[in-house]
Swiss-Prot record:
It comes from Mycolicibacterium smegmatis (Mycobacterium smegmatis). This is Catalase-peroxidase. The gene is katG. The active site is at 114 (proton acceptor). The record marks 110 as: Transition state stabilizer. Heme b binds at residue 278. Pfam families: peroxidase. GO terms for biological process: cellular response to hydrogen peroxide; hydrogen peroxide catabolic process. It is an enzyme of class 1 (oxidoreductase).
């Protein structure tokens, strides 16, 4: 800070100076925030690539010992003792945040639900798997108001069990224990979620810059932007008052179906979660919501991480304000029963207002008067419902489902148990990752189950490699097929990958990105090799091994003898074990590694490349190495030559980087205006190469150019091959959770 500017004259941290002079900062304001307050190059160039999402959860910010392994540590947990401690917390009301009805169970259910409920199936991001509810923005979402208190109530438990229990596991396990303590039988629980130590900044939560804004995520009639799932910024699912606060139950049902569907739930699962969840507890709106203080991230230091301080009355208990709605659904709010549906269908309902002015519903003609207990004082009142609750009654599909449960509560219990388990575990990956004594024996289609594979001897691997090498399949076919299979992996929810051999099944066999006609030929050839070999090898292993053969051939053509690491043991799933609708979300709409950009992309191709690399769990150097290598291996979608900057395609050379950075080439946009570029000889004007935005970004973006320069250097040829093989193997093995 300049010495002639008194510190008291500076704007507060987090605020920008608004009186920017003409011709000032190109970002539109006159004073950039310091780095410690969030200032960055993005303030100057807001449209630049965010390379930091390729540096997720680095070791340098992890306070645990370098050799600490949570998945081993959690297996030392005394789960019975943990359960008892959570139960004790639930039954011990604290004056600083008194328990509704003397039981924190409903609060813990909401905490677990809102942690897991951020998951969206389109990109696999969100969910409870990393304990993100502790960090911004989720810890400060309006829909998560008061969940800061739930986590603070559990701090003594976390403190006691230390590193053997992650916050990610504790947050959702507390909700599971709460259900069971109130009489519900869950389907079980799996431990194994590892905490991270910084917010996930690779998740796009929406375009809005104000809480509860809903003006920018919809187009047309009510088309919600992908990959978003919630209807408003800062909500988990839908607006409980109805769309945009309009108390229309039928319109609410439309939002519910869309939102829960984007979170991987069908109609039965959706109805079960709403009915089951709203069997317990209450909402809080007994006062003027506009008087509530700022959320945790904006609260003053003395609040020590808590937010939403309420100055009205005691500020807690009967005076608590969370959503502004004041609803208790049933007369048994801490007990599992069928009373939610009995009350929903046992009354006609009329619109009313909460003390905070929110739209909610009460029984007509004073129905069920004095039947529902007050949470913090003697006396009783009537039940209430949300607009989103009445949606279950007015929507014909939801009504058919829930009316049956009214007469068959055992079916509701079964469906809620399954849906709740799915909610908590959807982002954990396959059942082989489930840990602990409460893992259920049952499995479900949504878990993408894969039969166990077989081990292979060194001799068997050698024979298979020889058969593949002599099969007539080209380096391009071998490498591209393995890449198509393995690169479906998503580190976000641990779905996809080569394991399972689903590249030969629908829907993957028919995806445009996979070039179905050519892929079908390669699949047939692999099936012939599989049969002719006489070896009990899975199709999945064969595809990866074939990719390795292609890489080894390409390295040899570049003058290097390498052996690409191969770990057998992949299994083959069947079509019956594959949920076609669910797997459709894994279809790549863009794959910059193969210069593929599908129709209707919402972002430029280079941004899609970074996003895909992030989902694959790649670092920026790994991404750079793979793009450069795959270009010279000639694996582009459709056989295009964009970015194939070599006269030796099929050889694993550094030619992509050398020729991209060669200043004798001048680049200009193609007159076809199709997002491609033409590289011409500066001296003669003769065309030399063509490229895409993904190709040119490695020369244009300063960070990527720095990486490209490393591999273009004369002494990097061997290093490039070594680094490519390492990055390739990482992708091939990304879904091998059975391999250390």
């Amino acid at each position: 800070m300049p010495e002639d500017r008194p510190i008291e004259d500076s704007p507060p941290i987090g605020e920008a100076q608004t009186d920017a002079p003409a011709g000032g900062c190109p970002a539109g304001f006159g004073r950039i925030k310091p780095p410690v307050a969030g200032g960055s190059n993005x303030d100057w160039w807001p449209n630049q690539l965010n390379m930091k999402i390729l540096q997720k959860n680095p070791d340098v910010i992890n306070p645990l010992d370098e050799d600490f392994d949570y998945r081993s540590a959690v297996q030392n947990l005394d789960v019975d003792a943990l359960r008892a401690d959570i139960v004790e917390v639930m039954h011990t009301s604290q004056d600083w945040w008194p328990a509704d009805f003397g039981h924190y169970g409903p609060l813990f259910i909401r905490m677990a639900w809102h942690a897991a409920g951020t998951y969206r199936v389109s990109d696999g991001r969100g969910g409870a798997g990393a304990g993100m509810q502790r960090f911004a923005p989720l810890n400060s979402w309006p829909d998560n108001a008061s969940l800061d208190k739930a986590r603070r109530l559990l701090w003594p438990v976390k403190k006691k069990y230390g590193k053997n229990l992650s916050w990610a596991d504790l947050i959702v396990y507390a909700g599971n224990v709460a259900l069971e303590d109130m009489g519900f039988r869950t389907a079980g629980f799996a431990f194994g979620r590892e905490d991270r130590w910084e917010p996930e900044e690779d998740v796009y939560w929406g375009p809005e810059q104000e809480w509860l804004d809903r003006t920018k995520r919809y187009t047309g009639e009510r088309d919600l932007e992908n990959p978003l799932a919630a209807v408003q910024m800062g909500l988990i699912y839908v607006n409980p008052e109805g769309p945009n606060g309009n108390p229309d139950p039928q319109a609410s049902a439309i939002d519910i179906r869309e939102t829960f569907g984007r979170m991987a739930m069908n109609d039965v699962e959706t109805a079960a979660l709403i009915v089951g969840g709203h069997t317990f507890g209450k909402t809080h709106g007994n006062g003027d919501a506009s008087l509530v203080g700022p959320e945790p991230e904006a609260a003053p230091l003395e609040e020590v991480g808590l937010g939403w301080r309420n100055p009205q009355g005691t500020g807690v208990g009967k005076d608590a304000i969370t959503s502004g709605l004041e609803v208790t659904w049933t007369h048994t709010p801490t007990k599992w029963d069928n009373s939610f549906l009995e009350i929903l269908y046992g009354n006609e309902w009329e619109l009313t207002k909460s003390p905070a002015g929110a739209n909610q519903w009460k029984p007509k003609d004073n129905g069920w008067a004095n039947s529902v207990p007050l949470a913090h004082e003697d006396g009783k009142t009537h039940p209430s419902m949300l607009t989103s609750d009445l949606a279950l009654r007015v929507d014909p599909i939801y009504e058919q489902i829930t009316r049956r449960w009214l007469d068959h509560p055992e079916e509701l219990a079964e469906e809620f148990a399954k849906a709740w388990f799915k909610l908590l575990h959807r982002d954990m990956g396959p059942v082989t990752r489930y840990l602990g004594p409460e893992v259920p024996k049952d499995t479900w289609l949504w878990q993408d189950n894969i039969p166990a594979g077989n081990d292979l001897s060194d001799d068997e691997v050698a024979k298979l490699k020889e058969l593949i090498a002599d099969s007539g399949l080209t380096v391009s076919q071998l490498v591209s097929t393995a890449w198509k299979a393995a690169s479906t992996f998503r580190s976000s929810d641990l779905r996809g990958g080569a394991n399972g051999g689903r590249i030969r099944l629908q829907p993957q066999l028919g995806w445009e990105a996979n070039e179905p006609d050519e892929l079908a030929q390669v699949v047939r050839k692999y099936e012939e090799i599989q049969k002719a070999s006489g070896i009990n090898v899975s199709f999945a292993d064969l595809v990866v091994l074939g990719g390795n053969v292609g890489v080894e051939k390409a390295a040899k053509a570049a003058g290097f003898d390498v052996t690409v690491p191969f770990t057998p043991g992949r299994g083959d799933a069947t079509q019956e074990e594959t949920d076609v609708d669910s797997f459709a979300y894994l279809e790549p709409k863009a794959d910059g590694f193969r210069n593929y950009l599908g129709k209707g992309s919402d972002l430029p191709a280079e941004f899609k490349l970074i996003d895909r690399a992030n989902l694959l769990g790649l670092s920026a150097p790994e991404m750079t190495t793979l793009v450069g290598g795959l270009r010279v291996l000639d694996v582009n979608h459709g056989g295009t030559k964009h970015g194939v900057l070599t006269d030796k395609p099929g050889a694993l050379t550094t030619d992509f980087f050398v020729n991209l950075l060669d200043m004798s080439t001048a680049w200009k946009p193609s007159p076809a205006d199709d997002g491609t570029y033409i590289g011409t000889d500066r001296a003669t004007g003769s065309p030399k190469w063509t490229g895409t935005r993904v190709d040119l970004v490695f020369a244009s973006n300063s960070q990527l150019r720095a990486l490209a320069e490393v591999y273009a250097e004369d002494d990097s040829k061997e290093k490039f091959v070594k680094d490519f093989v390492a990055a390739w193997t990482k992708v091939m093995d990304a879904d091998r959770f059975d391999v250390a």
